[in-house]
A protein has these predicted regions:
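Rossmann-fold dehydrogenase core element
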Residues: 150-167, 190-192
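N-terminal secretory signal peptides and thylakoid transit peptides that target proteins
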Residues: 2-23
Length: 372
């Protein structure tokens, strides 16, 4: 049999059918290739180029998969130009606080990360929301519950997502704390303890109430509140008792606390005892039950965390970048139109706790019941 006899006749119908299939395959090819490619990164503008933005967010943004920096908002033009050169966005995407409303006209900016002093968060979050941009605000969310309410309302009105820069939720050591709390042979924890503190040696805005809203509780104590939330499945305490310790440097901490300790009671009987200070080093979290325990020390640093538990040592290698994971998670949630794991409502909850701590301390350690 010759080769011609082995080839079936090509009728007009089969030709058209095969041609159509071929055309469909050609048309489908770009779609297949597109499906294989990762989605484009969302653009973020950093608002406030201080130490945290430069020292932590800038390195993190070189590691992110879902978001890239496409602009900055700063009161120092030279800082903006430096960021432009490092990250490759045009100088026209450098905005001042007075001109930031113009970000509404920049389609390359999807999110704004507010990294200014605490008392400025409300103003800047609302401005970003009015520009139609999703917002991340650094912790604490604000300096009062009322400010948190205003930010949440503004973002809802603008139909944008609001998240808080709570990095502990993106560290594997605290993911392990959450996991162990649910394990029957370790958790649930009935006693939580620890704290975060260091010596604040140089005058700065963190020791000024008008900018910080408070002292170490606002800056560092918020981490212990977050850790307690992680260890209790985000339970809210029912009551708080607090005491401010006598100041060793009253001339330095004129209108904010230097050291404060507090106890949180939960509906199930769990008790949490924490301390925070600008005059001494502590960096620890511990959870205990009658069956087991977990301890992270250091607990609240950007890296170098170490853990131990009744079930053995806790170690994660290689180390992760908390901020990069946080940014990628929030960007992915924005892309999918869902709330992040660290929404504005969580920041509001924590500010309710902070206000109760300050109220108790101001009233000589009175037990303050919490209503959310």
């Amino acid at each position: 049999m010759n080769s011609a006899e082995s080839v079936p006749a090509l009728t007009r119908r089969t030709f058209i059918s095969q041609a159509a299939l071929g055309a469909a395959a050609v048309a489908l090819a770009p779609q297949v290739r597109a499906a294989e490619l990762p989605p484009p990164k969302l653009g973020i503008a950093i608002l406030g180029l201080g130490g945290y933005a430069s020292g932590q967010l800038a390195p993190a943004l070189k590691l992110t998969q879902n978001v890239q920096i496409t602009g900055v908002i700063t009161g120092t033009p030279e800082k903006g130009r430096n960021w432009s050169q490092v990250f490759g966005f045009p100088e026209k995407a450098i905005y001042s606080y007075d001109t930031m409303a113009r970000i509404a006209d920049n389609p390359t900016i999807d999110l704004v990360y507010v990294v200014t002093p605490n008392a400025l968060h409300r103003e800047h979050v609302i401005a970003a929301a009015k520009a139609g941009k999703h917002v991340i605000t650094e912790k604490p969310m604000g300096i009062s519950v009322a400010e948190c309410d205003a930010m949440i309302a503004a973002c809802r009105a603008a139909k944008v997502k609001l998240s808080v820069g709570y990095r502990l939720h993106f560290d594997p050591y605290f993911a392990e704390v959450a996991r162990l709390a649910k394990e029957k042979d370790v958790g649930p924890f009935q006693k939580l303890s620890g704290g975060f503190g260091f010596t604040l040696s140089q005058p700065q805005w963190r020791a000024e109430k008008k900018l910080a809203g408070g002292g170490p509780l606002m800056d560092l104590g918020i981490y212990s509140i977050q850790a307690a939330g992680i260890a209790t499945g985000e339970a809210v305490p029912v009551a708080i008792t607090a005491k401010e310790q006598p100041k060793k440097r009253p001339e330095f901490f004129k209108d904010v606390e230097e050291t404060i300790e507090w106890m949180m009671e939960y509906a199930d009987g769990t008790r949490a005892d924490f301390i925070t200070s600008y005059n001494g080093g502590i960096n620890r979290f511990r959870g205990e039950s009658d069956k087991g325990w977990v301890q992270i020390e250091p607990a609240f640093s950007y890296n170098g965390l170490q853990g131990d538990s009744s079930k053995g040592k806790i170690s994660f290698e290689p180390a992760v970048n908390q901020q990069a994971r946080q940014l990628d998670h929030i960007a992915q949630c924005v892309r999918e139109g869902r709330e992040s794991d660290v929404p504005g409502e969580m920041g509001r909850r924590d500010m309710i706790i902070v206000e109760a701590i300050y109220t108790s301390a101001a009233q000589g350690g009175k037990r303050i019941e919490i209503k959310v």
